[in-house]
Amino acid sequence: MPEITRDQVEHLARLAHIRMTDEELDTMSGDLEKILEHVSAVQAAAGDDVTPTSHPIALENVFREDVPAGMLTQEEALDQAPDSEDGQFKVPAILDGE
Protein backbone atom coordinates (compact mmCIF):
# COMPACT_ATOMS: atom_id res chain seq x y z
CA MET A 1 0.00 0.00 0.00
CA PRO A 2 1.42 3.44 -0.91
CA GLU A 3 2.35 5.71 1.95
CA ILE A 4 0.75 9.14 2.31
CA THR A 5 3.54 11.63 2.84
CA ARG A 6 3.37 14.97 4.57
CA ASP A 7 4.35 16.61 1.25
CA GLN A 8 1.36 14.99 -0.47
CA VAL A 9 -1.01 16.27 2.22
CA GLU A 10 0.54 19.72 1.97
CA HIS A 11 0.10 19.65 -1.83
CA LEU A 12 -3.56 18.60 -1.52
CA ALA A 13 -4.18 21.32 1.07
CA ARG A 14 -2.71 23.91 -1.29
CA LEU A 15 -4.88 22.67 -4.17
CA ALA A 16 -7.96 22.90 -1.94
CA HIS A 17 -6.90 26.33 -0.63
CA ILE A 18 -6.83 25.01 2.94
CA ARG A 19 -4.31 26.49 5.35
CA MET A 20 -2.81 23.86 7.64
CA THR A 21 -0.23 24.16 10.38
CA ASP A 22 2.77 21.81 10.53
CA GLU A 23 1.05 19.91 13.33
CA GLU A 24 -2.16 19.55 11.29
CA LEU A 25 -0.19 18.30 8.27
CA ASP A 26 1.54 15.65 10.39
CA THR A 27 -1.74 14.58 12.00
CA MET A 28 -3.60 14.48 8.69
CA SER A 29 -0.94 12.38 6.96
CA GLY A 30 -1.16 9.85 9.82
CA ASP A 31 -4.97 9.85 9.74
CA LEU A 32 -5.07 9.35 5.98
CA GLU A 33 -2.56 6.51 6.29
CA LYS A 34 -4.88 4.76 8.79
CA ILE A 35 -7.89 5.27 6.53
CA LEU A 36 -6.05 3.72 3.59
CA GLU A 37 -5.06 0.75 5.76
CA HIS A 38 -8.73 0.15 6.61
CA VAL A 39 -9.78 0.48 2.96
CA SER A 40 -7.05 -1.96 1.98
CA ALA A 41 -8.28 -4.45 4.59
CA VAL A 42 -11.85 -4.21 3.27
CA GLN A 43 -10.65 -4.70 -0.30
CA ALA A 44 -8.66 -7.77 0.72
CA ALA A 45 -11.62 -9.25 2.61
CA ALA A 46 -13.99 -8.78 -0.33
CA GLY A 47 -11.90 -10.87 -2.70
CA ASP A 48 -12.24 -11.13 -6.46
CA ASP A 49 -15.43 -13.19 -6.41
CA VAL A 50 -17.56 -10.46 -4.81
CA THR A 51 -19.41 -8.23 -7.26
CA PRO A 52 -19.01 -4.53 -6.46
CA THR A 53 -22.30 -2.85 -5.54
CA SER A 54 -23.44 0.57 -4.45
CA HIS A 55 -26.00 -0.89 -2.01
CA PRO A 56 -25.85 -4.01 0.16
CA ILE A 57 -29.27 -5.17 -1.03
CA ALA A 58 -30.89 -5.07 -4.44
CA LEU A 59 -33.10 -2.05 -5.00
CA GLU A 60 -36.30 -2.14 -6.97
CA ASN A 61 -38.82 0.50 -7.88
CA VAL A 62 -41.55 0.52 -5.24
CA PHE A 63 -43.58 3.29 -6.85
CA ARG A 64 -46.91 2.78 -8.51
CA GLU A 65 -47.32 2.65 -12.25
CA ASP A 66 -47.37 6.15 -13.76
CA VAL A 67 -50.84 6.09 -15.30
CA PRO A 68 -52.62 9.35 -16.12
CA ALA A 69 -55.81 9.75 -14.10
CA GLY A 70 -58.70 12.17 -14.46
CA MET A 71 -57.45 15.58 -15.45
CA LEU A 72 -59.01 19.03 -15.35
CA THR A 73 -59.84 20.78 -18.57
CA GLN A 74 -58.24 24.16 -19.15
CA GLU A 75 -61.55 25.84 -18.30
CA GLU A 76 -61.93 23.87 -15.04
CA ALA A 77 -58.40 24.80 -13.95
CA LEU A 78 -58.84 28.47 -14.80
CA ASP A 79 -62.21 28.61 -13.01
CA GLN A 80 -60.34 28.13 -9.73
CA ALA A 81 -57.80 30.89 -10.43
CA PRO A 82 -58.32 34.38 -8.99
CA ASP A 83 -57.42 35.91 -12.38
CA SER A 84 -56.82 34.63 -15.92
CA GLU A 85 -56.29 36.10 -19.37
CA ASP A 86 -56.23 34.50 -22.84
CA GLY A 87 -56.50 30.98 -21.41
CA GLN A 88 -53.58 31.42 -18.97
CA PHE A 89 -53.18 32.12 -15.27
CA LYS A 90 -52.53 35.80 -14.62
CA VAL A 91 -50.24 36.60 -11.71
CA PRO A 92 -48.74 39.84 -10.39
CA ALA A 93 -45.46 40.93 -11.99
CA ILE A 94 -42.42 40.42 -9.77
CA LEU A 95 -39.53 41.65 -11.96
CA ASP A 96 -40.40 45.30 -12.71
CA GLY A 97 -40.76 44.97 -16.48
CA GLU A 98 -37.83 42.63 -17.10
Swiss-Prot record:
GO biological process, one term: glutaminyl-tRNAGln biosynthesis via transamidation
Transmembrane segments: none
Keyword Transmembrane: no
Gene3D superfamilies hit by this protein: Glu-tRNAGln amidotransferase C subunit, N-terminal domain
Catalytic activity entry: L-glutamyl-tRNA(Gln) + L-glutamine + ATP + H2O = L-glutaminyl-tRNA(Gln) + L-glutamate + ADP + phosphate + H(+); L-aspartyl-tRNA(Asn) + L-glutamine + ATP + H2O = L-asparaginyl-tRNA(Asn) + L-glutamate + ADP + phosphate + 2 H(+)
Keyword Oxidoreductase recorded: no
Keywords: ATP-binding, Ligase, Nucleotide-binding, Protein biosynthesis
Enzyme class label: ligase
One Pfam family cited in the UniProt record for this chain: GatC
Function noted in UniProt: Allows the formation of correctly charged Asn-tRNA(Asn) or Gln-tRNA(Gln) through the transamidation of misacylated Asp-tRNA(Asn) or Glu-tRNA(Gln) in organisms which lack either or both of asparaginyl-tRNA or glutaminyl-tRNA synthetases. The reaction takes place in the presence of glutamine and ATP through an activated phospho-Asp-tRNA(Asn) or phospho-Glu-tRNA(Gln).
Similarity comment text for this entry: Belongs to the GatC family.
PANTHER family to which the protein is assigned, alphabetical: GLUTAMYL-TRNA(GLN) AMIDOTRANSFERASE SUBUNIT C, MITOCHONDRIAL
Oligomer status and interactors: Heterotrimer of A, B and C subunits.
This protein's name: Aspartyl/glutamyl-tRNA(Asn/Gln) amidotransferase subunit C
Organism name: Micrococcus luteus (strain ATCC 4698 / DSM 20030 / JCM 1464 / CCM 169 / CCUG 5858 / IAM 1056 / NBRC 3333 / NCIMB 9278 / NCTC 2665 / VKM Ac-2230) (Micrococcus lysodeikticus)
Organism placement in taxonomy: Bacteria, Bacillati, Actinomycetota, Actinomycetes, Micrococcales
